[in-house]
Design a protein with these regions (language model features):
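Nucleotide-sugar donor-binding catalytic core of glycosyltransferases
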Residues: 2-76, 85-92, 115-274
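N-terminal Rossmann-like NAD(P) cofactor-binding module of classical short-chain dehydrogenase/reductase
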Residues: 82
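Surface-exposed amphipathic alpha-helices with a cationic face
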Residues: 94-101
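A short, histidine- and acid-enriched strand-loop-helix "catalytic/donor-clamping" loop
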Residues: 106-118
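Conserved acidic donor-binding segment of nucleotide-sugar-dependent glycosyltransferases
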Residues: 247, 278-284, 293-298
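Hydrophobic alpha-helical packing elements
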Residues: 287, 300, 304, 317-324
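A short, well-ordered alpha-helix in the C-terminal region of glycosyltransferases
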Residues: 293, 300-314
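C-terminal alpha-helical cap of glycosyltransferases
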Residues: 317-337
Length: 337
């Protein structure tokens, strides 16, 4: 595998998506021969079909999805194909990839065993995990679960990270007592935020109104950096699937020199040790106590913020990609031997 090899990317094309972070990182480390098959529309259609579960509609969908994918495969000379999630791909597509002898990688940013949301997983991915040369997963717990079920597949622990282009330090004065939370709505997050005694600025989609807090629209990267820079506290509230692990914001907040107050978890404590490079909580009561502690101890929290920023430097997507490519080299050697 060399830097002239053609690399295919399959996934969604949105500004804040993992796909674009990794494409930027590939370019940063001089892998410029990239072909991107974006699948926004068909992924959206597939998620709707999952709700109805009609086999005839799925057959029709598979016809169009396979046609699009075949054209992409035969038109290009791919050496590696990185699929982000790929829940909409059926078994026939994997046969085409195998025939072309393409090294196949999956970077899975969700829980493949979670069928609660139609956008999170599908029977397709569960059936076809064994077709991947490397299946990358962000959680150590999920990696163990996958390894116990699929004995012949290589599973690779690939945590989230931050984008050097998108997540940067913006020089803004901290607004005293500004608490921000940037993220999407879910019931657990809502209940937790409702219990916070101080006013929180919430940025994201689908949030109902609060008596005490201010709800703002979803923000993109430039605005994200500004909000983090202005906040005395940047909250990170882990969703159910991320408990005891981490999420994308785990690395993004420190990389933008934010002070992260986050749900207590084992993995986050490894990346950004509690009370040294982050502050953590388990309950609403503890969360309120930590907020007061931060407001009353600016010198201590300034050191925590600075330490976390320095520690974040080894967690860029450039670094993640170099680590993954090293393992892809090994697979390529085995294939050739």
């Amino acid at each position: 595998m060399n830097k002239k090899d053609q690399i295919g990317i399959f996934g969604l094309n949105y500004e804040n998506n993992l796909e674009n972070f990794y494409i930027n990182s590939l370019k940063n480390i001089k892998y410029d021969n990239i072909k991107f098959l974006e699948n926004n529309f068909l992924f959206y259609v597939f998620c709707i079909l999952q709700k109805f579960n009609n086999k005839y509609l799925f057959r029709l969908f598979n016809f169009f999805q396979n046609l699009k994918f075949k054209k992409f495969i035969y038109k290009n000379d791919l050496k590696i194909l990185i699929i982000f999630k790929g829940i909409e791909l059926d078994s026939n597509i994997y046969k085409i990839i195998k025939n072309k002898k393409i090294i196949l990688v999956n970077i899975y940013p969700d829980d493949p065993f979670n069928f609660e949301s139609p956008a999170t997983s599908s029977k397709n991915i569960i059936k076809n995990i064994e077709n991947y040369d490397i299946f990358c997963i962000w959680s150590k717990k999920l990696k163990k679960k996958l390894e116990s079920r699929y004995k012949n597949t290589i599973f690779f622990y690939l945590p989230f990270g931050y984008s050097e282009e998108k997540h940067f330090v913006k020089k803004n004065n901290i607004i005293k007592k500004k608490i921000s939370f940037i993220g999407s709505y879910d019931k657990k997050r809502y209940d937790l935020l409702k219990g916070i005694n101080q006013t929180v600025d919430i940025y994201g989609n689908d949030w109902p109104s609060f008596e005490r807090h201010k709800v703002h629209k979803y923000v993109k990267n430039k605005e994200l950096a500004k909000i983090i820079a202005q906040s005395e506290i940047s909250l990170n509230l882990l969703k159910k699937q991320n408990l005891n692990s981490h999420n994308m914001r785990t690395f993004e907040i420190p990389s933008m020199r934010g002070l992260m107050l986050t749900t207590r978890s084992y993995e986050q404590n490894i990346f950004f040790p509690e009370n040294r490079a982050s502050l953590m909580f388990t309950s609403t009561k503890e969360l309120n106590k930590k907020i007061e502690y931060i407001f009353n101890n600016p010198i201590i929290t300034k050191k925590i913020r600075a330490r976390a920023y320095l520690m974040s430097k080894k967690h860029s997507y450039n670094m993640r990609l170099k680590y993954l490519i090293k393992h892809l080299y090994e697979i390529n050697k085995i294939r050739k031997s």
